[in-house]
Structure formats: C-alpha cells, structure tokens
UniProtKB/Swiss-Prot annotation:
PANTHER family: FLAGELLAR P-RING PERIPLASMIC PROTEIN FLGI, FLAGELLAR P-RING PROTEIN. InterPro entries: Flag_FlgI. One of its GO terms (cellular component) is bacterial-type flagellum basal body, distal rod, P ring. It comes from Bradyrhizobium diazoefficiens (strain JCM 10833 / BCRC 13528 / IAM 13628 / NBRC 14792 / USDA 110). This is Flagellar P-ring protein 2. Pfam families: FlgI. GO terms for molecular function: structural molecule activity.
C-alpha cells in the first residue's frame, strides 16, 4: 500500500505583519504578454538512441524530405516507366523527431535570442548528445517568428541492456540555451496605447481597491491628478500623463507597494496528501472524532496430497484469513479562532493525512469551516 505523504503548508502571520508587495508582482499589463510558438524538427547525432524508423514513419519521411531538399537523392532508381521511383528504406537510430516549443517574450526584437524546449515525438530513448537542425517556429497565426538550432542539453539519462534498464530524469526532453533566433517582432507598443490597463493575477475586490488607492495617492503628489479608476475587481485602468513616457510611468507605478488580501481557502490534493490552509481560515466550535478501521485479508491455500497408491488427486484447498482491527480514537474540540488552534486540535487526534483531508471535508459539509475548500 502506498503511504500517503503529508505536506501541511501553513500561512500563519498576523494581519499587521503581512508583507507588502510591489504592484508589478501581483498585476500584469494588458497587451504585454508572452506568445507561444512551436515547430517540428529533427535531432541528429544521437548515439543509437533515436527513433526506430519502422515504428516512427514520420521520422523517416522527414529525414528523406530534408536530404532531398539538400540535393541528396534517397530514392531508388526507376527501372521502367511503369515502376516509379520509391523511397529507399533508411536504417539509422541516430535521428529523432521532436517538437520545439518556446515563449516569445513581449517587445522582443528581431535578432535577439531565446531558449527553446525540445521534446521527443517518437520512440527515442534519449536526446543526449543530439543537435537540433534548423527548425522554424510558428505562432497561432501561422507566421514564422523564430528559427531554432543548436546542441540539446539533457538533464536525465537512460542506460541499460537486454534484461535491465536504468534511467533518471527525462532524457527524451531537453533545452537549448539561446537556441532560437528571433526573426519577427510581435506587433504592439506601449506608445500606441491611450490607456494602460493593469490586470490582477489573483482578482480580489480588496486588493483592487488598495492598488487603486495607492496609485491615486502617489499620482496626487507626483502628477497632481487622479489617474486610476477601477473597471471591475480584476482590472484597473490608468490614464498616462502627457509629460512622461510609458516606460518610466509604469516603472514608477510598479514599484508602489500594497498589502494584497488573500481569501480564506483550503486546498486539498488527495493524490499527494497535500493540505494548504490559508491564513484567514476560521472554524466554528465543533467536536471531531475519527475512527481508523483496518481490514486485512490473507490467502493461505492448503495443498492436500492423497495417500500413496490410492489413485487420488492433489487438491488445493483455499483458506482465507480475515482480520479486522478498529483503533481507538479521541474526541477533540476544535475552536478555530485562528489557524494555529485548528492545526493543534487536529494534531491532538493523531491523524494521518488521509484522515485530516476527510475531517476538513466533513467540517465544511457541517457548515463549520468558514472557507472555500478546493479539491484537486
């Protein structure tokens, strides 16, 4: 049985001691975002760890097309007018088909370089030592924005023989540092925007109000005007002053600090046993007990042998032993004035992670947990 691990992360700090954060760390500028680009290519130079061409026909077709584009004939000669040329069956394990992905940063210029991620498509066992040949990277609009090429860096490894294989990490995926050359800039500029819009990464009414007040308080002394107004609890619109550039303006606004408000929330991951409890979680007075019932089933078959020369047959008699054990449990009174008391009360019962998850869900069902419970 797989043991359930517990990672109980407590966000415990007084409201007065909550750290202030910069606006640029909790809000994004609308219109300035990354764009995903992707391309299909080949990694060559593998030491026998590439695709099996019989199992990955797309790799063979790509290799033939690449060689033909370079002027290398990889087709059989035509024997007659009725027998057209057919592709030669290639036999190599040094090539792997890959998908190349990258994030195109906003305002990046043509000629700059960026990192790319290379992931195997076929049955290659490792990309270690391989080199990606020139691959075009396209965005959702179909245009080519970058070209990638270079040696692949792989963190994992995979070695083995016919009877055993040892691997660590993921050797079928890697990265190429500065492996892509940007060929086209993303359209858009801050100078063309009449209004600058801030979008909160974690939308909240209180946080949006605090950001709005901080910006207008700063702008009242710096620009002698109120420049910010809220559109909703996620969006804040800024009116840029005329005598200052957008870069300097956003730099000044981004350095302002506020105290973001965090909602009362409990996040539960049943697969890993992780429980994350927010600082503002409250619980009404409730009594909790949790029983632990363990049932063990053991099969102990008995073989019955016949007597010598009796012409009997050997018979396997099934024998099952069932044991049930119910451990005693304690009753704890949980009165959650704060998170520390809640955790202290749960620890008094001596629960495992699965028990804590079950109790939190039951308390929420009873209406005593004053927080949102998110189960992943």
């Amino acid at each position: 049985m797989t043991r359930l691990l517990l990672a109980l992360i407590l966000v415990v700090s007084a409201a007065s001691a909550q750290a202030a954060v910069r606006i640029k760390d909790i809000a994004d500028i609308k219109g300035l975002r990354e764009n995903q680009i992707v391309g299909y290519g080949l990694v060559i130079g593998l030491n026998g760890t590439g695709d099996t061409l019989r199992n990955a026909p797309f790799t063979e077709q790509s290799l033939q097309s690449m060689l033909e584009n370079m002027g290398i004939n990889v087709r059989n000669e035509t024997t007659s007018t009725t027998n057209p040329a057919r592709p030669t069956t290639l036999r190599t394990r040094n090539v792997a088909a890959v998908m190349v992905t990258a994030d195109l940063q906003p305002s990046i210029g043509a000629g700059e370089r960026m990192d790319v991620t290379v992931s195997s498509l076929g049955d290659a066992t490792s990309l270690l030592g391989g080199t990606l040949v020139m691959t075009s990277l396209r965005a959702a609009d179909g245009a080519v924005y970058a070209v990638a090429q270079g040696a692949v860096t792989v963190a994992g490894y995979s070695v083995g023989g016919q009877a055993q294989n040892v691997s660590q990490g993921t050797p079928t995926a890697g990265r190429i540092l500065n492996g892509a050359l940007v060929e086209r800039e993303v359209q858009g500029s801050l100078h063309e925007m009449e209004f600058l819009v801030l979008e909160l990464k974690n939308p909240d009414f209180v946080t949006a109000t605090r950001i709005l007040d901080a910006i207008n308080r700063y702008a009242g002394g710096r620009y002698r005007a109120q420049i910010a107004f809220e559109r909703d609890y996620r969006t804040i619109v800024l009116s840029k002053p005329r005598h200052i550039g957008p870069v300097r303006f956003l730099a000044e606004i981004g350095e302002l600090t506020v105290e973001p408000d965090t909602p009362a929330r409990v996040v539960i991951n049943e697969r890993t046993g992780t429980v994350v409890i927010g600082r503002d979680v409250r619980i009404s007075t409730v009594a909790v007990t949790h029983g632990n019932l363990t049932v063990r089933v053991t099969e102990m078959p008995v073989v019955s042998q016949p007597a010598p020369f009796s012409r009997g047959q050997t018979v396997v008699v099934p024998q099952t032993v069932v044991e049930a054990n119910e451990a005693g449990s304690q009753v704890a009174i949980l009165s959650g004035v704060d998170l520390q008391r809640l955790v202290r009360g749960l620890n008094q019962i001596g629960l495992k992670p699965s028990g804590i998850i079950a109790i939190l869900q039951a308390i929420k069902t009873a209406g005593a947990l004053q927080a949102d419970v998110i189960v992943q």
